[in-house]
Amino acid sequence: MEMSEGIPVLFFFPLLEEPDSGVITIGEVTLDTSKYTKKEEYQLRQQTAMVFQNYNLFRNKTALENVTESLVANKKMSKKEAETYGLALLNRVGLSAQAKQYPVTLSGGQQQRVSIARALAVEPHALLFDEPTSALDPELVGEVLQVIRELAKQETTMVIVTHEMQFAKEVANRVVFMEDGKILHEGTPEEVLSSTTNARMNQFLKSIN
């Protein structure tokens, strides 16, 4: 399975579970899932950044500090350089005014946007989203989806697990429907999310509509 940089996609990332077979290519790193070392796994993971459904922010650090932590620790930026870049990323997700606030003072939608800015900080070849709106109140979902829409417009490669079907239809160029670890249907959003000959897919679409 190959992911071309700069194309928004929608499917499940195999290394979140132990894979049975296949080849994964992200950026310039390729991993044969039938036989790989911890070093190869680490190299592949360095090509990605994860956005969790429950934010996973450091509660004792401000929004800006959450974004700059990896820049200082891993990219060896100076604190000043990291703060300048971190503020630019927070501005990108509409949160520059909240830079000095702690997570406890932010709404769920704002926390998730900080999480997205933090993921962008490491400049990954692919952003991985695990149900990014499932922990949010309905009125906060839109602000997070809008940030992801903007990333898609900028041709950011994204791997998103979601139940937001209308959103998937808008931003994805490829959709994979999975159940119990098996791919049941895949194709363009129109092919997968419209009427289909796949009975299980039809059942799912009816249940969410």
Description of each model-found segment:
Residues 102-106, 110:
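Conserved ABC ATPase signature
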Residues 31-49, 79-80, 153, 193-196:
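ABC ATPase NBD coupling module
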Residues 186-187:
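ABC ATPase "signature
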Residues 127-130:
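Catalytic Walker B motif of ABC-type/P-loop ATPase nucleotide-binding domains
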Residues 14:
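Helix-to-loop junction immediately C-terminal to a conserved catalytic motif
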Residues 121-125:
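A short, proline-enriched helix->beta-strand linker immediately N-terminal to the Walker B motif
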